[in-house]
């Protein structure tokens, strides 16, 4: 697999189109979420804010996109703050250049690992943690399902809730903080911290 992280304008239209079609397949067709799909692509207003994306591609000549993540700076609009503020349960929405929000995670991989995540998902999480720490990001926030929360906890990540889960659409949704501290890094990388890897790379 090939993992790339960059701003929207750094990716060509072909890759962005594949990403938006993948999101439509995963969120609308597979999960049945109430999302808007235009020309077989799932796009929302946050995609107009020059977000960062992680694109996961097959390591083949076609290099088809089969996974993606959207990454937004919390100093501007983002989903937890502006779309799902009820999941904050009255707490102040994070606003810091050192905190990013993850959203629109989609992957086409049926392989499951021992902790519930596919090997591809775990590799994507490692790449995201490495990139975040390289850019002085200390905390990630996300709106996800209770099922994914359980897998994160089982994997050993340092995860905490803003408050109880709520039923949103067909999902039991929860807002989480993920600290990119030693606990999370050891869970993702074993005994060697990301900072140590960066220092010798």
Swiss-Prot record:
Any single Pfam family the record assigns to this protein: Autoind_synth
A GO molecular function for this record? N-acyl homoserine lactone synthase activity
Q: Which domain of life is it from?
A: Bacteria
Q: Which UniProt keywords apply?
A: Autoinducer synthesis, Quorum sensing, S-adenosyl-L-methionine, Transferase
Q: Does the keyword Transferase apply?
A: yes
The free-text function statement in the UniProt record for this protein reads: Required for the synthesis of PAI consisting of 3-oxo-N-(tetrahydro-2-oxo-3-furanyl)-dodecanamide also known as N-(3-oxododecanoyl)homoserine lactone, an autoinducer molecule which binds to LasR and thus acts in elastase biosynthesis regulation.
> Per its record, how is this protein called by name?
Acyl-homoserine-lactone synthase
- State the organism named in the record: Pseudomonas aeruginosa (strain ATCC 15692 / DSM 22644 / CIP 104116 / JCM 14847 / LMG 12228 / 1C / PRS 101 / PAO1)
